Design a protein with these regions (language model features):
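Primary detection of the long, small/polar-rich alpha-helical "axial" segments characteristic
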Residues: 1-274
Length: 274
């Protein structure tokens, strides 16, 4: 037996330190909810997790972007519902005026209603706004709006939505004439062309909205799957970690007990000297 070096105590202290460190990590993981709290815990796992988080953030913002685009489309399409309704009324009035049975006074009344309708069409186009944009009267004629609907810097993730000027002047129904049957026939043709133009634009917006709704669904599913994968890499499995904590706590207590007994061993030398 030697007393200069207590190998048993040194060994017990080393194991005590190991168990203390392990227990501290268990507590950190349980309290934070993450099994990777620093690069030293899992360098590769942390890098993969951060890449996934970047992608998740991009996907979630892309969902917001797509929903904004849907909101703009719904705003524009809703306004054009009224434009369509007024154009249909214009069609009725011009068809009515094409009949030769109306007096000048009656035609004047029809003209007055047509003028009121064209002013309202222009007002709606001018005042329809979404987040500062006026899709039915863009600042620059027929300038598309671009929406970014993906998580990566790829041009395929950029989607454009056309903006069309839907004022009465642009639709060429701002000065419909019904003073005689010939003028009324010409006005009917102008109204028909305007109805077709509005119908075409509404169809384009409807197709874009359908695409965006599918895009939102796909983005949400992708985000959900990547979030689940990232969670498996980074989040603490509470059941496993509690089991490890219990084991390390028992080992720590055992190491403390063994260290105490190891430190008492040299005392046996004193009994030999008595």
């Amino acid at each position: 037996m030697v007393i200069q070096h207590n190998i048993a105590a040194i060994n017990s202290y080393r194991n005590l330190s190991i168990n203390q460190n392990a227990l501290s990590k268990n507590l950190e993981k349980l309290s934070s909810g993450y099994k990777i709290n620093r690069a030293g815990d899992d360098a590769a796992g942390l890098a993969i997790s951060e890449t996934m988080r970047s992608q998740i953030n991009g996907l979630n913002q892309a969902v917001n972007n797509a929903n904004d685009a849907i909101g703009l489309i719904q705003t524009a399409e809703g306004a054009m519902t009224e434009t369509h309704s007024m154009l249909q009324r214009m069609k009725t009035l011009t068809t009515q005026a094409a009949n030769g049975t109306y007096t000048s006074t009656a035609r004047g009344n029809i003209k007055a209603e047509l003028d009121a309708l064209n002013k309202e069409i222009t007002r709606i186009a001018t005042t329809t706004e979404f987040n500062g944009e006026t899709p039915l009267k863009p600042a620059t004629k027929d300038t598309p709006l671009t929406f970014f609907i993906g998580a990566s810097a790829d041009t395929t993730n950029a989607m454009t939505v056309e903006q069309k000027n839907m004022t009465a002047e642009e639709l060429k129904v701002n000065d419909l004439k019904v003073s005689n049957t010939t003028a009324a026939f010409n006005s009917m043709a102008s109204v028909d062309a305007a109805i077709e133009k509005v119908s075409t634009y509404r169809a384009q917006l409807g197709a874009a909205q359908n695409r965006l709704e599918h895009t939102v669904n796909n983005l949400k599913v992708t985000s959900e799957n990547i979030t689940s994968a990232e969670s498996r890499i980074r989040d603490t499995d509470m059941a496993d970690e509690i089991t490890a904590y219990t084991k390390n706590n028992i080992l720590l207590q055992a190491a403390q007990s063994m260290l105490s007994q190891s430190n008492a061993m040299p005392q046996g030398v004193l009994s030999m000297l008595q």
